């Protein structure tokens, strides 16, 4: 009974703290760059089970706070039965009070990882990490480094170019810190002060490569072992990026000290709570899981975190299969010997619960040979994990666009991939228990099994709707170049948006060229294929790697041209003119099935088409052709103007 009374009393203290202190922390977090960009928890070890581990951790955090009063960087290590090493780095443009405040927020958030033996947290103004070994000179790590992209999309292609330029420029600044802002793009780069110049350079060069994968989004962040790089379409750093670190006990510093002290109190309370919960899980903890636990509490979908941790060798770098904007995928071997793919999720938005369970809810109950099967998830460990069937080969884009792999796929295999993807989409649109729109069909989301059969993956953006509805109205999300025009302009989502994305995919597979690859003489891929179609020279658009096969296999070249026509049908400007996926399958498989003549895709000015591709100077095209909707063709079937583009463009 005494134990129960203490537990309840402790919960009352936590509640009191939450209502009294947290409003001050959250109210300040909008201006002082204390938004959490990423929290990464390591595995558990014998040292983290030591009774002295959490008290040592609390002492380390307090010592860092004292050191941070005179500078923006500090390290601390306490040697007891369990050694803990910690590092804090504020960005060089932060004032003393903002640095203290950022650390106060970080040290209240990072205990969420306890009792993990390691953790790191990135805020927009500082970085905090602890380990059981000395890590201060580490620069990069393929297993731990991550990046994140915002959800909202920028439609101006010049923005992506400016991001690449600005990020590269800020990364070469000397001294381990730099900011830059030009043409609506602002960037900040920061190395930890414990790194040498060469290690800093290596870390930031990798960071630049990572944020370049976000260039179509308004913001991107690279969160590496030894550095941080962020870009945005608005200025987020202070002044010119430099702030002298004077120790002045002004109002801001006093507020920061008070908040830091309160954070320290919270740490002590939290440490006590962790120790108590290691002995016994209370009923209150189970109720906090609420609907989440009840929904996935059957043995078929629920995995223990410890099982997946061991299956991946504690998320070993050697088991890493790939990395994306919202997590890293590892190969796992279950106790029964079965191979699975374990996705270790990174949540950096307030809507992470919706993002996580959207994918679980939609695909846990559907099965098709051309859809990656979700086997289950883990939600009660220090981080959330998704478990998929293991698909041994890489994604389609690595076969098509990697020069060393581009000749691996012959035409027969490419046609099989196109047909399999079509069958998977047809199942989602009408054959599954609910109608599902994928919203992000692209080459990197089509995986290939050991027989090079396609499997559609990544249902994080998918949406379902009832049979009685004609469309959904929603903010846009997806990948530029693959998104249907009516969806981008009006926010109206139907199955025909997936059909458009599929059409782009077909053109990429048959031509061996990325949709966003721009050639000054011929424009983007969609422009080039359409121009050649109007000139009756469609064969020139096909991948040159297939030329020898077309010469050897009679009829294969004509078949490939037929597939290109189907791709053009799917990318027509008007959704009503695009075929359904069932019709696409019939066009691809039935020799006598009629294939209509396609109308012009969006983004093109039909009157500017020339009768001779070789006279490139007479071809008019817009460099914004795949992303700017104010310059679209006006045809009898579709008209898109700026007056229609008032849709909110975020999820």
Curated annotation (Swiss-Prot):
PANTHER family: CYSTEINE-RICH RECEPTOR-LIKE PROTEIN KINASE 3. Its EC number is 2.7.11.-. It catalyses: L-seryl-[protein] + ATP = O-phospho-L-seryl-[protein] + ADP + H(+); L-threonyl-[protein] + ATP = O-phospho-L-threonyl-[protein] + ADP + H(+). The active site is at 440 (proton acceptor). The modification Phosphoserine is found at residues 444, 473. The lineage of its organism: Eukaryota, Viridiplantae, Streptophyta, Embryophyta, Tracheophyta. This is Cysteine-rich receptor-like protein kinase 42. It is found in: Membrane. Residues 273-651 are cytoplasmic. It comes from Arabidopsis thaliana. The modification Phosphotyrosine is found at residues 388, 487. The modification Phosphothreonine is found at residues 474, 479. It is a single-pass membrane protein. Residues 29-251 are extracellular. Belongs to the protein kinase superfamily. Ser/Thr protein kinase family. CRK subfamily. The chain crosses the membrane at residues 252-272. ATP binds at residues 321-329, 343. GO terms for cellular component: membrane.
């Amino acid at each position: 009974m005494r134990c129960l009374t203490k537990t309840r009393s402790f919960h009352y203290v936590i509640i009191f703290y939450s209502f009294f202190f947290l409003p001050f922390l959250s109210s300040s977090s909008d201006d002082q760059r204390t938004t959490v960009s990423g929290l990464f928890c390591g595995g558990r070890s014998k040292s983290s089970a030591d009774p002295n581990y959490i008290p040592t951790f609390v002492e380390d955090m307090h010592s860092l706070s004292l050191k941070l009063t005179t500078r923006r960087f500090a390290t601390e290590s306490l040697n007891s039965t369990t050694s803990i090493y910690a590092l804090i780095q504020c960005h060089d443009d932060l004032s003393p009070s903002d640095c203290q405040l950022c650390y106060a927020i970080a040290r209240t958030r990072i205990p969420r990882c306890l009792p993990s033996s390691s953790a790191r947290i990135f805020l927009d103004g500082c970085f905090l990490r602890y380990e059981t070994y000395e890590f201060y000179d580490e620069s990069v790590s393929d297993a731990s480094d991550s990046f994140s992209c915002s959800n909202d999309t920028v439609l101006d292609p010049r923005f992506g170019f400016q991001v690449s330029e600005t990020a590269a420029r800020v990364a070469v600044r000397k001294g381990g810190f730099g900011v830059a802002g030009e043409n609506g793009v602002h960037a900040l780069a920061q190395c930890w002060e414990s790194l040498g110049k060469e290690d800093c350079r290596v870390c930031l060069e990798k960071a630049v490569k990572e944020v370049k994968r976000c260039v179509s989004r308004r913001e991107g962040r690279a969160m590496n072992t030894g550095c941080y790089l962020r870009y945005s379409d608005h200025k987020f750093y202070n002044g010119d990026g430099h702030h002298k670190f004077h120790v002045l006990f002004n109002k801001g510093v006093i507020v920061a000290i008070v908040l830091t002290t309160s954070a320290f109190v919270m740490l002590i309370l939290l440490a006590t709570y962790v120790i108590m919960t290691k002995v016994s899980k209370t009923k209150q903890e189970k109720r906090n899981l609420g609907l989440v636990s009840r929904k996935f509490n059957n043995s078929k979908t629920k995995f223990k975190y410890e099982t997946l941790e061991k299956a991946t060798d504690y998320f070993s770098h050697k088991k890493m299969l790939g990395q994306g904007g919202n997590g890293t995928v590892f190969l796992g071997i279950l106790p029964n010997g079965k191979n699975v793919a374990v996705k270790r999720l990174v949540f950096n938005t307030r809507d992470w619960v919706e993002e996580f369970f959207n994918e679980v809810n939609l695909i846990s109950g559907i099965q098709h040979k051309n859809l990656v099967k979700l086997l289950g998830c883990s939600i009660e460990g220090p981080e959330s994990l998704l478990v998929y069937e293991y698909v041994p080969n890489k994604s389609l884009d690595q076969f098509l666009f990697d020069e060393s792999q581009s000749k691996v796929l012959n035409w027969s295999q490419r046609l099989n991939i196109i047909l399999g993807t079509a069958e998977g989409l047809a199942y989602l649109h009408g054959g599954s228990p609910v109608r599902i729109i994928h919203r992000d069909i692209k080459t990197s989301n089509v995986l290939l099994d050991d027989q090079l059969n396609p499997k559609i993956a990544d249902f994080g953006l998918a949406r379902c709707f009832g049979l009685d509805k004609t469309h959904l109205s929603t903010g846009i999300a997806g990948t530029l170049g693959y998104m249907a025009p009516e969806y981008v302009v009006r926010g109206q989502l139907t199955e025909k948006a997936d059909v458009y994305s599929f059409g782009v995919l077909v053109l990429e597979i048959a031509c061996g060229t990325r949709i966003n690859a721009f050639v000054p003489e011929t424009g983007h891929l969609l422009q080039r294929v359409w121009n050649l179609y109007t000139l009756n020279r469609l064969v020139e658009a096909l991948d040159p790697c297939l030329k020898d096969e077309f010469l050897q296999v009679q009829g294969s070249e004509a078949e490939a041209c037929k597939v290109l026509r189907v791709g053009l049908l799917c990318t027509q400007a008007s959704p009503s003119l695009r075929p359904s996926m069932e019709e696409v399958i019939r066009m691809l498989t039935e020799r006598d099935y009629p294939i209509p003549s396609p109308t012009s895709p969006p983004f093109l000015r039909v009157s500017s088409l020339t009768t001779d591709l070789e006279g490139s100077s007479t071809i008019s095209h817009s460099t914004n052709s795949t992303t700017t909707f104010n310059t679209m063709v006006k045809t009898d079937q579709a008209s898109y103007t700026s007056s229609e583009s008032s849709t909110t463009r975020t999820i």
